[in-house]
């Protein structure tokens, strides 16, 4: 089922039960595959994904780490979509996660965090999140683990 929500920019239909990020954006990993396929069929150029990421409400746990399994799952699903494209000979030549470190989001301030590295805005201390180590392994081994 759907429900209609009104916003200043447009009317948006939200499917009930669809997973969403902390920014309330839908999580739609198949969209990356279909976008790569469409753009390749239309323009016949290689694809570089320059920004793909998920906002989350992250915090430092009592063990001093930042555990973000939702972000790992998000990236894993989107990379699987790109792998599907590569398997179909769509020329995907790059993928950049947004963002390496938590930062100031123009519309949301410091509440929502996109980074693979947690930033304590008071002390400027950086703490690599679980997703940082997972993504480093993906890059090192050139495969989704």
Where are these regions (language model features)?
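Short, well-ordered beta-to-alpha junction loops that form the rim of enzyme active sites
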Residues: 4, 52-53, 100
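Aromatic-rich peripheral "rim/lid" segments of glycoside hydrolase catalytic domains that contact
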Residues: 57-67, 73-77, 84-85, 91-145
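A short acidic, glycine-rich active-site loop
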Residues: 17-29, 69, 120-126
């Amino acid at each position: 089922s759907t429900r209609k929500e009104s916003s200043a920019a447009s009317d948006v239909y939200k499917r009930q039960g669809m997973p969403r990020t902390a920014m309330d954006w839908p999580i739609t990993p198949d969209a990356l595959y279909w976008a790569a396929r469409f753009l390749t069929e239309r323009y016949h150029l290689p694809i570089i994904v320059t920004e793909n990421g998920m906002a989350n409400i992250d915090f430092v746990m009592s063990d001093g780490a930042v555990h973000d399994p939702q972000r790992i799952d998000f990236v894993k699903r989107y990379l699987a979509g790109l792998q599907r494209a590569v398997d179909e000979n769509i020329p995907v030549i790059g993928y950049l996660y947004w963002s390496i470190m938590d930062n100031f989001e123009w519309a949301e301030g410091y509440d929502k965090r996109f980074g693979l590295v947690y930033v304590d805005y008071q002390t400027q201390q950086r703490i690599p999140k679980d997703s940082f180590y997972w993504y480093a392994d993906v890059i090192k081994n050139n495969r989704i683990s």
